[in-house]
Amino acid sequence: RGLGDVYKRQVSVGSIYNYYDSKAELISATVESVWCEIFHRPQDEAVFQDVQTCVKWMYERMAYGYEQYPGFFTLHSLGFMQEDKADGKRQMQQIWHHILNGLCTVLQQDTKIRPGAFNEQFTVEKFADVLFSLMLSALLRQDYDPAAVLEIVRRTLY
């Protein structure tokens, strides 16, 4: 799980660096790996058929991420963005873009959303942005209770 496990297995920390062009690249790959572990696709695909179920799942995964990697969400960008800011920002944007696309897909697939919930001014993409912003805010506040977000979803979409 960390350097302690590397030492136990008698792996030279320096040898790990040989696989990457820079420390920033190593940290970036590690951050991506952690994000992927936290938000890995669940066994139950029903999670992505319903916005409320998806939001609950996302907040559960955020709580899991906090338990497994304390401080990761609030500090992850600092380490890999210092040395190579452009690459770090690009990496973070790719991860976030993937999450946003997933939210859009769920919003498009949820058959319980009332007709007319979306229009030209209030699109699926804009609501996905709102949900994502609420998620990022929850991450920074370490607040993994989705109740308020679920109520917003219920009142807005159903």
Language-model features: locations:
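Short secondary-structure transition hinges
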Residues: A63-N101
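An amphipathic alpha-helix adjacent to DNA-recognition modules
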Residues: N18-H40, K56, E60
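Hydrophobic alpha-helical bundle segments that form small-molecule/ligand-binding pockets
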Residues: K85, W96-A128, L157-Y158
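Short hydrophobic/aromatic patch on the recognition helix
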Residues: R9-Y20
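Amphipathic alpha-helical segments that line or abut small-molecule/effector binding pockets
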Residues: Q52-E67, A147-L150, R154
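Short alpha-helical scaffolding segments that buttress acidic/His motifs in well-ordered protein cores
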Residues: H76, L131-M135, V153
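Amphipathic alpha-helical interface segments
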Residues: S15, R61, G65, V130-A138
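Short, small-residue-biased leader/transition segments that mark boundaries at the very start
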Residues: G2-Y7
